[in-house]
Regions:
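Metal-dependent phosphoesterase signature
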Residues: 1-2
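C-terminal cap/substrate-recognition subdomain and adjoining C-terminal extension
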Residues: 5-9, 14-17, 24-245
C-alpha cells in the first residue's frame, strides 16, 4: 500500500516500537516486512512448511486446489462475499476432511483472531507496554479480535480501508489511498488521547463521496456510512495495485 514505507520510517524516527502480526504465510510476510525494515523477531505470521506439505500431496490434491483457485478468480472479493464464503466453506468443511490435502491443511495454524491477540500479548510483555498504550491497524475479519482487545483496553484501534467485520471492532477508521494518513490520528491520540483523536476526526469531516483521507469515529456509532466509504477505498487501492502489476 502506498505510504507504508514512509509510515514505518516516520514511526521509527519518532521512537515507536513497531511489530507486524499477520495471517499471511511466512514466506511472503518475512520478505515484505524485511523490505519495510522490520526485523524477523518483530513479525508474527503463519508458519507454512511448504516443502514438507508438498511431499504429502498427490496429483488429485493439487487438481482440487487448482479447481478452487480458478473458481475464486472469477469472483469479486467485495461484491461476491456470500458466494466466496459458500465456496470456501464447502471446500474446507465438506471436501477436504479425510483427504491427504485436508490432513496437510489441518497442520497449518493461521495467525488470526485469538492468535493475533496472543501474539500482541507477547510483544506487549516483551516491551513492557500495557495494551492501553498500543496503536493497532487492521482491515479484516482476522483483525477483529486484536482490534477489540486494544479498543477495550483504551488504546487506539485503527481500521484502515476495512470491511464491516473490522469496522465493528475498531474505535477509529481511516479510508485513504495512503497508509501515511493514519499518522495524524496517531499524533492526535498521543497528544490528547481518544478525545484528541475524536476532535481531529470532527475537524476533518467531509462528504462521503469526497477524495480521501476520510476519518471516522466508530465506537458506539452506526458504521453504515463508514462501511461504504471504506469499501470504495478498498476497491481503489486494488485498482491501483492491479495497474502496477
Amino acid at each position: 500500500v502506498k505510504g507504508a514505507r514512509e509510515l514505518m520510517e516516520r514511526l521509527a524516527a519518532d521512537g515507536y516500537q513497531v511489530c507486524c502480526i499477520t495471517t499471511t504465510y511466512e514466506q511472503y510476510a518475512r520478505r515484505l516486512t524485511q523490505r519495510l525494515g522490520l526485523p524477523a523477531e518483530q513479525v508474527a505470521c503463519t508458519a507454512f512448511p511448504i516443502e514438507e506439505l508438498r511431499a504429502r500431496l498427490g496429483d488429485a490434491d493439487m487438481a482440487a486446489v487448482d479447481r478452487v483457485e480458478a473458481a475464486l478468480l472469477k469472483l469479486d472479493m467485495e461484491r461476491d462475499e456470500e458466494r466466496l464464503r459458500d465456496l470456501l466453506d464447502a471446500f474446507y468443511w465438506q471436501e477436504l476432511p479425510g483427504t491427504p490435502l485436508g490432513e496437510a491443511v489441518a497442520t497449518v495454524k493461521p495467525v488470526g483472531g485469538r492468535r493475533k491477540v496472543q501474539a500482541l500479548g507477547q510483544f506487549a510483555r516483551a516491551w513492557q507496554f500495557d495494551l492501553s498504550r498500543w496503536v493497532v491497524v487492521g482491515d479484516s475479519i482476522t483483525d477483529n479480535a486484536v482490534l477489540a482487545a486494544v479498543r477495550d483496553a483504551g488504546g487506539l484501534a485503527i481500521v484502515f480501508n476495512g470491511n464491516r467485520y473490522a469496522l465493528e471492532r475498531g474505535n477509529v477508521g481511516v479510508a485513504s489511498l495512503s497508509l501515511m494518513d493514519v499518522m495524524p490520528l496517531v499524533e492526535a491520540w498521543e497528544d490528547g488521547g481518544l478525545d484528541g483523536a475524536r476532535q481531529l476526526i470532527s475537524r476533518e469531516a467531509k462528504p462521503p463521496d469526497a477524495d480521501g483521507p476520510h476519518y471516522h469515529w466508530l465506537a458506539g456509532t452506526d458504521i453504515a456510512e463508514a462501511s461504504e466509504v471504506h469499501a470504495r477505498f478498498r476497491r481503489l487501492v486494488r485498482q491501483v495495485a492491479a495497474a502496477l502489476g
